[in-house]
Amino acid sequence: LHIDSTLWTRRAVQELIAQQCGVKMPIRTVGEYLRRWGYTPQKPLKRAYEQDPKAVKHWLEYEYPSIKQRRQEECGEIAWGDESGLRSDEHSGRGYAPVGQTPEIHLSHKPRVRVNFIASLSNQGTVRFMLYTCKLTAKVFIIFLERLIRKAERKLFWIVDRHPVHRSESVKQWLAEHKSEIELFPLPSYSPELNPTEYLNCDVKQGVHSKPPTRNLTQLKDRVISHLRKLQKLPARI
């Protein structure tokens, strides 16, 4: 196919029809047919070129089942972890306005503030989190690990990405000293779509950034905490 498009847009389908059938169909008609056939315009998932499909397949078919088997044998709990952050000048979502009158959001020129958080999401929807404003370091990460095991009633099988901090020597040493309470399992590289905590991160950002922008660090923290606590009460949401 000689179509200059990475996605099946109406224009791309129009070109395909012209190539295969010799018919120049109006773009509006193409959209109507796509709608009738059950197709809707969707934002594509992003996957890194560096992702190894074989590694992903092996993880799904062998490594994750092995983790589940061990969890069952040791009466533990599987959870997923990830880090994320929110800036005060970010905004998400759309708002209605008359045609040709794009809505505006007024932002301050004061220095922006940022809040980061680490979250843990169990297979049963249990959410645990910790906020921080500094750069993620092994020390910060270990503080969260200590909080996790302090509140855990069973051994935690925690699945995370391959962030350098997760693989640092101090973290490895700490984990070796607490192996009976928690173990870390790495996801395949460049595979955020395998981590359900990504959905939690998106939910938090959508909820926080749907409110009026703020330049107040305390207010931004309060909004993040409020939304995460709401998710803690809605285990079926994520």
Enumerate the language-model features and the residues they cover.
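A short, amphipathic alpha-helix used for macromolecular contacts
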Residues: 1-25, 72-73
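Extended, low-complexity cationic-aromatic segments
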Residues: 12, 61-146
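Major-groove recognition helix of helix-turn-helix-like DNA-binding domains
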Residues: 26-38
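C-terminal anion-handling pockets and recognition modules
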Residues: 29, 74-78, 197-238
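Short Lys/Arg-enriched helix C-cap and helix-to-coil transition segments
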Residues: 41-57
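RNase H-like polynucleotidyl transferase catalytic core
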Residues: 45, 102-111, 176-196, 212-213
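Acidic/histidine-rich, metal-coordinating catalytic segments
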Residues: 82, 153-167, 195
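RNase H-like two-metal-ion nuclease catalytic core shared by retroviral integrases
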Residues: 114, 161-162, 169, 185-208, ...
